[in-house]
Amino acid sequence: MRILITLPWGERLGGAEAMLHGVLEGASHEHVELVFLQPGPWADELAAAGFRVEVVRAGRLRQLHRWLATVLRLAQIIRRRRPDVILNWSAKTQLYGAPAAALAGMSGRNIWWQHSIATGAWIDRLATLLPTRAIGCTSLAAARAQEQLRPRRRTFVVSAGSPPPETSAGAASLPAGTGRPVVGLVGRLQPWKGQQRMLEAQGLLRGQGHNFHLLIVGGDSYGLSPEYPAQLSTTIEQLGLENAVTMVGEVPDPGPYIQTMDVLVNASDPEPFGIVLLEGMARGIAVMAVNSGGPPEFIEHGRTGVLARSGEPSELAKALKPLLVSPQLRAKLARAGRDRYLRDFTDTAMRERFFAALEALCVQ
C-alpha cells in the first residue's frame, strides 16, 4: 500500500503532528510520501529520516491564484506517484488535496483526517463538502461531531498512541523551594485549552488551604492566540499566584517537565483526544481531564485517572482536590494508568491500528 500524505504545517507543535509523527516513525520510507504545504523543520527532519518529501508553498487560502497553482501542482504529483491512498492531514489540506485528486482521476482514493472536534466552522463544512472516501478521527467523540455535518460522510476512528519515554531523560528543574505537589498542563496557549480556568481553579483551592505549584508548558504555537499569554500573566498577578506558577513557554520536548509533575491535567472542554495524557500515563503520572471529548474513551474515572464533570474552575478544583491530599490515590491511579497505556496506547499499537484501517479502506 502506497500512501501520499499532504500536510499543512512545516513544524511539529501540536497533537495532530505528534500523532502523525508517531505513525511515521515506524512506517516504510518506500511506501509513504509526504507533501508539505509550507517549509519548516519538520519537513526537513522527515526528509533527513529517508522519506520522500516535497514542499509546495501554498500561501494563504484566500489567495485564489496560489490555491489554484497548489491544486494543479498536487494533481501532477498524484498522477506521477499514483498512490493507493491520498491522506490529507487536516481540513485545510483537504481543500487542496480533494480537488487535486479529482483532477488526477483518483477521488476514490482520497481520505482526510479530522483531528479536532468539528464545530461547524466554515473550513470543516467546506472540507466535508468535497469528495472523500472516508474521514479519519482520533476519537469516537470527534467522529460523532463530524457525522453531524452534511453531506454525511463515512468516518473511521484510530485512537492515538505515544512512544515509551526515554529512560535517559531526566526531570526538568523547578524553582527552588517549591515543596508542594506539582500540577502541570502541557499544550499550546489558547483559551480552549483551559489554562485560564486552571489558574482560577488554583485560586479557589488556595482559598481552601490546598497549595500546589502549577507548571504551564507551552507557547503561542502558530500565533493563533497572541494576546492569551499576557492575559494569563495578568490573571496570575490578580490572584496573587506569582510564586505558585511557572510558565516555561514552548519547549521541543515536554517529557522532562512532565516527569516533575505529581498530576498532569488536561483542562480542555472538550479535548479531541489528549495525547499528552498518554505521555503522563506512560511515565507513571496521575492524570486528570474533563469528562468530554476523547479523554473518557481511555481514562476510567477513579481507576486510571480522574475526570472533572466540566471545565469550569469550580469543577476542576473539585476533581483535583482528592489528588492533592492523597499521595496514595495518585500512586494508585498512576500505576493503573500506566498499565492501560502499555496495553492499548503505545506508538506500536497506534501504528498497527492506523495502517490496518487504511488497508481495510483500500480493499473495500
Q: What residue spans do the PLM features occupy?
A:
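Short His-centered aromatic/hydrophobic patch
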Residues: N88-Q94, Q114
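A conserved, positively charged/aromatic
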Residues: G108-L140, L149-P151
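A short, well-ordered alpha-helix in the C-terminal region of glycosyltransferases
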Residues: E315, P322, L329-D344, M350-R353
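Aromatic "clamp/platform" in nucleotide-sugar-dependent glycosyltransferases that forms part
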Residues: E250, D269
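A conserved nucleotide-sugar
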Residues: H29-H31, Q195, L199-T246, V325-Q328
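Short hydrophobic beta-strand element within catalytic cores of glycosyltransferases
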Residues: V35, A286-A289, I299
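Conserved acidic donor-binding segment of nucleotide-sugar-dependent glycosyltransferases
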Residues: N291, H301-G302, V306-P313, P322-P327
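Conserved donor-binding/catalytic core segment of Leloir-type glycosyltransferases
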Residues: L4, A176-K193, L199-Q202, L215
